[in-house]
Structures are given as C-alpha cells and as structure tokens.
Curated annotation (Swiss-Prot):
Quaternary data: Component of the super elongation complex (SEC), at least composed of EAF1, EAF2, CDK9, MLLT3/AF9, AFF (AFF1 or AFF4), the P-TEFb complex and ELL (ELL, ELL2 or ELL3). Interacts with ELL, ELL2 and TCEA1.
Residue positions, PTM Phosphoserine: 146, 151, 154
Region (Necessary for interaction with TCEA1 and transactivation activity): 248-262
Amino acid composition bias (Low complexity), ranges on this chain: 174-192
UniProt entry tagged with the keyword Phosphoprotein: yes
Annotated organism of origin: Rattus norvegicus
Gene symbol of the encoding locus: Eaf2
Single GO cellular component term: nuclear speck
Ranges where the record places region Disordered: 124-154, 170-232
Swiss-Prot/TrEMBL keywords: Activator, Apoptosis, Nucleus, Phosphoprotein, Transcription, Transcription regulation
Location of region: Necessary for transactivation activity: 177-262
Name listed for the protein in its UniProt record: ELL-associated factor 2
Amino acid sequence: MNGPAGLAYLDRRERILKLGESFEKQPRCAFHTVRYDFKPASVDASCEGNLEVGKGEQVTITLPNIEGSTPPVTVFKGSKRPYLKECILIINHDTGECRLEKLSSNITVKKTRGEGSSKIQCRLEQQQQQMWNPPRTSNLVQHSPSEDKLSPTSLMDDIERELKAEASLMDQMSSCDSSSDSRSSSSSSSEDSSSDSEDDDRSSPSGPRRYSSEHPSVSAGPQYRTSDADTTCNRLYDNSALLMSTLRSDLQLSESDSDSED
C-alpha cells in the first residue's frame, strides 16, 4: 500500500513474510498492474469492470459509470507487457499478515476518445450504418457512368459525322476546280474565234466591215448543276468574261472611228 494509510500498518516490529501462490512451479493465480492515463470521476469504483485480452496482447477494459451518467460505461484500450522481476507486497489489514506475490504483466491503457458504450449499443450502430450506407453507394455507382462518361457508340457516331463532312467538303472543292477549268477553256476558245473574225475583216478591203456589238454569251459552254460553292465560282467567272467582252467592243469601236476619219 502507498501513502500514510499503508505506512500506519508498518511498524518496527518484525513480521512474517510469506510467498504467495504465484511463486509456485505451477502457479494457480497471476497478478497484474493496470495503469490508466486518465480515469474520469464518473467511473463507479464500487462496481466490477470487464477486462478482455484479444489478439496481439491487445487489452480492452470496460468500467461502469455512476448511475444516471451518459454514457453508462467508460472504455479503455491498450496493451500488456510481461514483467521480468517485479513483485507486489500485499498486507492484510485485519491480521497484519504480509504476502509477496510475483507480478505477471503490466497493462497500460488509454481512455477512448468517444466515451464507450455497451456491446449491444455498438452492434446496433453497426447495423444502422450497414442499412444506410449500401443504398447510397449503389445510387452513386448507377448515376456516375451515365453522367460523366460517354458511350463508345456515341463517340463512333461523332467520328463518322466528321469524316462525312470532310468528304463532302473535298467533293465540293474538286467540283469547283473542274468547273473553273471548263469555263476557262470555253472563254479561251471564244477569244480565239473573235480574233480570227477580226483578222478576216481586215484582210478583205472591199467587203463591208462587220462589228459585233453583242456580248459573247457565256451560256454557250457546257451547263453544270453545282452546289453553293460552284455557284460562287460561276459568278466570278461570268464577271471576268463580261469585263473582257466590254473591253473588246470598246477597242473595235475606237478602230472604226479612226478608219472613218481617214
């Protein structure tokens, strides 16, 4: 015992010291020490507690609290380590007998953060968590693929649309090039024919001179049915041909005026 109360039973007279049962070859009992880091005042010291030893020398101590306290119990958890050469002196206050016992292990525990509850309450909480958690996780799993990820078929459809758009654009460009080539060839042929007619008129002095004041028809060339891109190309070519014919007619009129003055 420690403190003044224990020292009161230890006087200077000699006493008989007995070795306890823990010193026998096959001890029938064992003694342990328990060290708490913090023991709240709500623990009822008059009641017995519960000590459990699990795997890996893990120890759980459950002590009841004073009636009316919340929670009803306090839980401590820790571990135990064996003693090598440690003993404890036990003094009988009634007879004054002293008995020495060998210590088996030292248990060091700490109070859990959430004040402990009974085993029944722990099981109920676990069951409630199992009932609530699975539906939430299943809903998340069901909704996440449809909202966040695209299906492979939709990706293939998008790629196919892009390829078709590129192919149609290439076709329009090729048709525009072919139409421009044909129209350039038709305009060059019309220019050659007009130049030949002018040479014939100049070579025949007695014959009457004929002047074509009409504009060459652009529609003499082959007709094409084109798209919007081809229509734009045709308009550009028509404007250039009209400008050339206007310049040619002005040149002819100026030549005729000079001949009349002579």
